[in-house]
């Protein structure tokens, strides 16, 4: 988990569909894994993911509530955008976050987030 992810959460859009005053979060200690699987979103649509981003519940900094961020982005009429910077400085993306899953540990605490990216 040595990559860094930059998330952009829109608060609204102008008439040209450019984000207005987006909030940007930079999260360290994440891991991007390539993927080519089909998943159902919260809106019950099927999407083919390009990757899954793993965000640790303990070591990734800062700790964010990705479900709340996704709800805020959807309320603004958009989705969370994400780019990932690798250990050597290479940037991958941009991706759109379409699936947000918080997975618990054995004691029902948050273990990690899995973010499905397209």
Enumerate the predicted regions with their spans:
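Short, conserved turn/kink motifs that form compact alpha/beta structural patches or helix kinks used as
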Residues: 18-118
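Active-site-proximal polar cores
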Residues: 1-26
């Amino acid at each position: 988990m040595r990559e860094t992810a930059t998330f952009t959460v829109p608060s609204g859009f102008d008439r040209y569909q450019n984000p207005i005053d987006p909030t940007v979060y930079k999260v360290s200690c994440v891991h991007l894994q390539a993927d080519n699987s089909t998943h159902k979103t919260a809106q019950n649509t099927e999407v083919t993911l390009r990757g899954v981003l793993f965000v640790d519940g303990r070591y990734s900094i800062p700790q964010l509530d990705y479900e709340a961020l996704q709800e805020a982005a959807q309320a603004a009429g958009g989705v969370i955008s994400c780019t990932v910077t690798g250990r050597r400085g290479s940037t991958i993306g941009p991706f759109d976050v379409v699936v947000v899953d918080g997975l618990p540990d054995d004691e029902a605490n948050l273990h990690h987030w899995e973010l499905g990216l397209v």
